[in-house]
UniProtKB/Swiss-Prot annotation:
GO MF assignments: cell adhesion molecule binding
InterPro entries (alphabetical): Adhesion/Biosynth-related, FAS1_dom_sf, FAS1_domain
Gene behind this protein: mpt70
Subunit structure, interactors included: Generally found as a monomer; homodimer in culture fluids.
Protein name, UniProt field: Immunogenic protein MPT70
Species of origin: Mycobacterium tuberculosis (strain ATCC 25618 / H37Rv)
């Protein structure tokens, strides 16, 4: 009986140490990321809040606001594009995987769509929440179909530097923030009608 208790206590302690090691693992380094634009992004932002290391210190909406590639997304999330839509507190308070359209992705949208998003809060909210999935998903596990906060599903295909989210290519993904895993994508995803 004493041997079983000792083995159980040892196993419990080992499991606790393993969990602690995972909990304090460093954020992804530039070499752990996926996507053809990661090396360029890491080189352009080697230090500071916009760096891969810097983003890991902040909740996702704060990290996005520090990222020079995500200024349009930040404006859309924070009420700057449409004062009736502010998802900052929501995104900063849970664990998420965020498929983050870059500034270049937003620039592909027609000007009329951007104008509509400035006044149509339900459409903007639907589009933004279609880019967010509950729970953090690493590059090794991101492929598959997942339900978004918007309610519809999004499918991730490919592998390594050739991941796609719907029809959008992942530019750089697997970026850890304090509460999310971010995949920067080259197109804005539109939820199904």
């Amino acid at each position: 009986m004493k041997v079983k208790n000792t083995i159980a206590a040892t196993s419990f302690a080992a499991a606790g140490l393993a969990a602690l090691a995972v909990a304090v693992s460093p954020p992804a380094a530039a070499g752990d990321l996926v996507g053809p634009g990661c090396a360029e992004y890491a080189a352009a932002n080697p230090t500071g809040p916009a760096s891969v290391q810097g983003m890991s210190q902040d909740p996702v909406a704060v990290a996005a606001s520090n990222n020079p590639e995500l200024t349009t997304l930040t404006a859309a999330l924070s009420g700057q594009l449409n004062p009736q839509v502010n998802l900052v507190d929501t995104l900063n308070s849970g664990q998420y995987t965020v498929f983050a359209p870059t500034n270049a992705a937003f620039s592909k949208l027609p000007a009329s769509t951007i104008d509509e998003l400035k006044t149509n809060s339900s459409l903007l909210t639907s589009i933004l929440t279609y880019h967010v999935v509950a729970g953090q998903t690493s590059p090794a596990n991101v492929v598959g179909t997942r339900q978004t906060l918007q309610g519809a599903s999004v499918t991730v295909t490919g592998q390594g530097n050739s991941l796609k989210v719907g029809n959008a290519d992942v530019v750089c993904g697997g970026v850890s923030t304090a509460n999310a895993t971010v995949y920067m994508i080259d197109s804005v995803l539109m939820p199904p009608a």
